[in-house]
Amino acid sequence: TQAVAEHLMVGETAITQGMRDAVANASAGAVFFHWPLEFPRVFHRGGFDVVLSNPPWERVKLQEQEFFAVHDAGIAAAATKAIRGGLIKGLADSNPALLQAFEEAKHDAEASSQFLRTSGRYAKTGVGDVNTYAVFAGLGRSLTSPRGRAGIIVPTGIATDNTYREFFAEVTETGALASLYDFENREKLFEAVDSRYKFSLLTLCGEKQEEVQFAFFLTQPSQLSDK
């Protein structure tokens, strides 16, 4: 817990074998990844020269219907949230293992959301109804060296949604934004994405850019070469 961590840092609590085991188990389950520890030479030089990312576009908050669509179609298809809630409670008798799996998934999602909101690493992207695409946009920027660039495929909401206004204002005002190419999916560049959905090729850089390139309402990458 946070309280235990604070006591450990000031030497008021001894590290027990039980604590070591708990940390090892948590690490195995959460699959912790620390970029500077994994790539010490890269970060000794300031970061990556090139970062390319096509991150997931998903809400961190657990979606009940999505979870049960995989595990129990009947619950997923419930007509209302209230009915679905009753069916979930009923799992305590009919399928306690599934209920436990649901509660664990819900806890993991809430813990992830809490970390993204409060850790300080994602101050401008781990906000609102936290979405992974914004988190990855912020991460891509933080991994990039002063001379490097990060290219990320994200929903255009990174630039237009009120939730991320502080992030986009920061990359614009500091000169970290190199380009934003906005696409509509009317020609189904992404088959699984709704045709009305808008996404962008976002390029961020370490060095301050004097000029920024923008394009909007594109439908094909070939249009980027149009003058």
Regions found by a protein language model. Give the residues of each.
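Signature of N6-adenine DNA methyltransferases within the class I
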Residues: F33-K227
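Conserved helicase NTPase catalytic core signature
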Residues: T1-P40
